[in-house]
Amino acid sequence: MPYADTMLVEVERKLDAGVPLSMDDGLALYRTWDLHGLGRLARAQKERKSGKKVFYVLNRYINSTNVCFAGCTFCSFAADEFKEPQRVFRMTPDQVFAKALETGTNFNQLHIVGGHDPRQLSLDYWRPLMRRFKSELPHVQLSLFTAAEIEYMAKRHRLSFPEIVSALKEAGLDNVNGGAAEIFAEGTRSKICPNKVSAENWVAIHEELHRQGVASNATMLYGHIESLEDRVDHMIRLRESQERSPGYNAFIPLAFHPDGNELSYCGWTMGLDDIRTFAVARLMLHNFDHIKAYWMIQGLNVCQVALQFGADDMDGTHGSTDAEMIYHSAGTQSGQYVDDREFRRLIEDAGYTPIRRNSTYNEFPLDWTPSVTLSVVEGQLATGSVEGRK
């Protein structure tokens, strides 16, 4: 079937020949009026990678602190401990552990996000907690930190990137979440997150993670002051990083949310922009296996449509008592939790097969559950042995 926009024919030829798309190609894809053709092309590339599979994970999501001194202009979540102490929260390791188990143990991923908190972001805090999770919940993969937090800990402990990655891997780190990438273009990055890890160090840390066998994801924050050129440049840099040091599992487009931050004048992204971004990412990032449509960001309706535009993952259910605060502080209207049966229905209605996974895309039967003995010891939740059962 021919494309209404003949530019897509040339893009298809390049993809079929294994030729990476250029900056001009990426801009043309963003600007094409043939939305149906764009979706058809992206969908074909998705199905080359993962066929009719669409992935999701049963996970727990925890914000462990909102104390952060990075000062990003797009953030509505961070609290300054000295200027607004009434907003501050900070969980102890025991509180994090108990929160993770609040709704049981039937999950395969623990996703924790915090901030640049000097009292929490240290190896002394995290390594004992990570080892505890690995000892008592070995079926759960730890998806923790961003490159910004890893750089912060490296500076704090006077360690090189290889040394800090080695220390975290030894404690049980399975996957790094992919945040803090924002936009790599220096002119834009210097305006939205001047105190955060540089684009070069973000890439260097992720490549070191991959060299040491720790997987990661990659994100892009779009819909604020960046240009289309910035977006395509960001994708090209990620593609080149994947060529040098394979290990990125998924790319996650993150739509900017404007409520309560310095960039509120930018407003909300529109549905067509969201859908185009998923499709362009699938076509530009030929060496990324997965493009994730995170329902917490774009909402379930847009994410279901994104499955027809190159996305093949809807991220995690979260726990029924989890409370995501970063995007909810910025105005998201998404809920906090999606029952896995709802994920399966949405995926099947889009014409795909739901696949339960963990952080590194190992697949599980949909009805898989861990066998865990729970007990209460001196008022705290403790676990016994863990093994999977169908």
Task: Please describe what each predicted stretch is.
Residues 82-97, 117-169, 181-182, 197-201, ...:
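Canonical radical SAM enzyme core domain
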Residues 110-120, 142-154, 184-186, 193-194, ...:
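Conserved strand-turn element in the central/C-terminal portion of the radical SAM core barrel
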Residues 1-34, 242-390:
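Auxiliary Fe-S-binding modules of radical SAM enzymes
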Residues 120-145, 171, 197-215, 269-287, ...:
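Alpha-helix-loop-beta-strand connector modules within alpha/beta enzyme cores
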Residues 142-143, 165-184, 212, 245-255, ...:
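Non-cysteine beta-strand/loop elements that form the S-adenosyl-L-methionine
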Residues 160-164, 225-239, 298-309:
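Catalytic cores of alpha/beta
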Residues 37-81, 88-113, 176:
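N-terminal pre-triad scaffold of radical SAM enzymes
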Residues 18, 42, 72, 112, ...:
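Conserved, mostly hydrophobic/aromatic
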